[in-house]
């Protein structure tokens, strides 16, 4: 049917009503989605394919062709005006000549790599990770610094070219990059080196703060430590650590954490049909893994993480924003996620201690990392007793979850 002209293709769905046609499309889509999900449990070789460009007619997992055709490598051309219909001169694969790091000893073509089907990726990887490559180590060190201090040494982590911002401390960036390479590209050593430095361990206050704000308002000179707000992932993981729910297991398949119920049940289109509703992982041990392992649906972001500036997965984010908006406060006070974490924290403190005073102390230790002061202790104990009496008179409503949902699709 694919090979026939449109006017000669036989009609589809003969004898089916529009309702039956819609159900058939949804069922086919479900079959495709669940096949993809089941494939995640199959062993997979982390390898690359060298050969002519294979023809793929679907979005399922690519497999090695049984018979690799003996055809030439696809030619890459300069597109005149950016148009696919106007190919210009053919070009060969190569590396950035501006960095001055050659890939071959041929003086005529020092920056080109092989044009054969095998060896191109390896040649590029060796060039990127070459100790004399001036870009790779600096880019890595710049991002690690940004992770610890909230802002990078060079202002555009995604752009180390002439249009990017110049580093505020170029000699420091060069020294860290050189030391990183000389010591075997050890990330653990780099993190330790930064975190044990006097700059990292500075106080957030300065005796001449007003003078510094006039001379260096953005603290480019690093005269004092600027506090960094937790990222969305760190915030969620930190709450799970405090409540004792965090599953610290390393590796494995992505998990489906709990998200807002209304968002989870919203109809979502995928490949011209309805996608299955979002379903959290069955067991708490699965749901409460680190956010690093959370499965991200591009068309259905987690509203809590999105509210706290988790980047859009469709974009390349070089530096996160740290906006403070009113819905963040409401979410931290009234969201289902926070209510569940508060309940889990209370249950943990009751399990560890029977005495109310020790329970209050334990909660503050877990959340703030310190013991309560005298006035805090009294206020918190009085508040807990007040809430206990209130809840004895007013039982909380039982939470009920839908066991089935109905979603309709309108053909236009």
Predicted regions and their residues:
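Primarily short, surface-exposed interaction patches in extracytoplasmic proteins
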Residues: 1-286, 311, 315-320, 333, ...
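Active-site Gly/Thr loop motif
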Residues: 290, 300-308
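Active-site-proximal helix/loop microenvironment
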Residues: 291, 332
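Glycine-rich phosphate-binding loop at the start of an alpha helix
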Residues: 323
């Amino acid at each position: 049917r694919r090979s026939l002209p449109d006017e000669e293709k036989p009609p589809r769905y003969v004898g089916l009503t529009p309702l039956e046609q819609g159900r058939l499309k949804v069922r086919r889509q479900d079959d495709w989605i669940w096949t993809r999900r089941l494939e995640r449990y199959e062993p997979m070789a982390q390898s690359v394919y060298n050969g002519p460009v294979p023809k793929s007619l679907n979005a399922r997992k690519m497999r090695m062709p049984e018979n690799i055709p003996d055809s030439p490598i696809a030619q890459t051309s300069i597109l005149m005006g950016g148009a696919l219909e106007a190919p210009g001169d053919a070009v060969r694969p190569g590396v950035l000549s501006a960095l001055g790091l050659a890939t071959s000893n041929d003086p005529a073509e020092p920056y080109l790599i092989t044009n054969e089907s095998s060896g191109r990726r390896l040649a590029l990887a060796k060039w990127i990770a070459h100790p004399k490559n001036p870009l790779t180590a600096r880019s890595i060190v710049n991002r690690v610094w940004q992770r610890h201090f909230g802002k990078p040494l060079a202002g555009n982590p995604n752009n180390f070219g002439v249009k990017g911002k110049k580093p505020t401390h170029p000699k420091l960036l060069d020294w860290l990059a050189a030391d990183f390479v000389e010591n075997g590209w050890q990330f653990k050593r780099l993190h330790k080196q930064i975190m044990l430095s006097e700059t990292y361990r500075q106080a957030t206050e300065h005796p001449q703060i007003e003078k510094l704000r006039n001379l260096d308002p953005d603290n480019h000179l690093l005269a004092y430590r600027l506090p960094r707000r937790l990222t969305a992932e760190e915030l969620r993981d930190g709450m799970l650590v405090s409540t004792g729910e965090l599953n610290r297991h390393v590796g494995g398949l992505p998990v489906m954490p709990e998200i807002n119920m209304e968002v989870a049940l919203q109809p979502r289109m995928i490949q011209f049909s309805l996608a299955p509703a979002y379903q959290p992982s069955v067991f708490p041990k699965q749901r409460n893994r680190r956010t690093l392992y959370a499965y991200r649906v591009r068309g259905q972001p987690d509203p809590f993480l999105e509210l706290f500036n988790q980047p859009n997965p469709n974009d390349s984010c070089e530096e996160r924003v740290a906006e403070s908006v009113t819905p963040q406060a409401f979410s931290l006070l009234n969201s289902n996620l926070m209510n569940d974490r508060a309940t889990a924290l209370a249950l943990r403190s009751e399990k560890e201690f029977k005495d109310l005073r020790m329970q209050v102390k334990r909660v503050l230790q877990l959340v703030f990392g310190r013991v309560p002061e005298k006035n805090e202790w009294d206020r918190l104990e009085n508040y807990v007793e007040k809430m206990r009496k209130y809840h004895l008179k007013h039982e909380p409503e039982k939470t009920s979850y839908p066991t089935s949902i109905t979603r309709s699709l309108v053909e236009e």
